[in-house]
Structure formats: structure tokens, C-alpha cells
Amino acid sequence: SIYKRPEDGIVLVDQGRCRGYQECVRGCPYKKVFFNPMTSTSEKCIACFPKVETGLQPQCFANCIGKIRMAGFINTPENARADNPLDYLVHIKKIALPLYPQFGLEPNVYYIPPIHVPTSFTRQMFGPGVDAAVKTYREMASANDMDLMGLLGLFGSTDRMMTKWKR
């Protein structure tokens, strides 16, 4: 009833299979599916997949006032490319982490953990790699890490998905 598209990892609700019993709402570990009483269906964000299919970022990414979201495609760790922005943040610098890795769902959304939140909370949300991620993020200026600072500066700079960047 809830499925992940293999081509881009977007998770959708199959309206033909997920009826008005609200089991899809209860089944979502991230609590992102809601029941719409007007249509008697379970619904969730569709990640603007029609835009993604044309190479554009989802609307919430493009309109993010904090410019903290970047959409794109990520490779497996063994195929990570340093010129792919998301590979660089997730696999090379390891500052972008999945939310609730203990669920074992292999999410396609990664976050740079907040630095002004209690460590006990961020460890619960992001797992054991969070301490190193926060340390790398905090020290990037003093370490003069121009690649990382430059890449983070690209967040929100375009409405298109970035698949490559030149260091």
C-alpha cells in the first residue's frame, strides 16, 4: 500500500490499495501519512514527483527560506563520486545522515544534524555517527575546508537538482 519508487526513492501511497481503514497511517514509521476525512483516503507528501521527473527540486526545497535543502541522487557508498553533491556530504564528509537509521528502512533523505540540540537527542535521531558529523560541521571554517563550505553555499542557489559540482 505504501511503496518506494525504485527510480528515485520517493515514497507514495497507493490509493487503490490503501483504503479508508487508516492502516497506512498506522504503518508509517515516520508518521508522515495522514487520513483525509473529506476523501476517506490516506495521503502524504508526494515529493512533487512530477517536478523531480523533469529535473526540478520539490517545491519545499525551492521555497525553503533557510536554504537548507538539496535534492539529488545518491550512489551506494562503494560507488560514491566526489563530484556528486549528495555523495560528498553523505559518503565522503559524512556530515549528512539518515533520520532514525535504527529503523533499517534505507531512507533517501539525509540531514545535516542540528548543532544546538542536546547530544542525547541527536544520537537518538541520527545514530552513532552524529558526534563526528557535528564535529566536522563545527570545525569546517577553522579547518579551512573550502570544498565543504562552497558546497553548503550552493544549497538553495538553483531550482534544478544538482547532480555534479566542480571542486
Which residues are covered by each model-predicted region?
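Iron-sulfur cluster-binding cysteine motifs and their immediate structural context
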Residues: 1-17, 23-40, 56-80, 97, ...
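Long, compositionally biased charged/polar accessory segments in the mid-to-C-terminal portions
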Residues: 66-167
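Membrane-embedded catalytic interface detector for glycan/lipid assembly enzymes
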Residues: 43-46
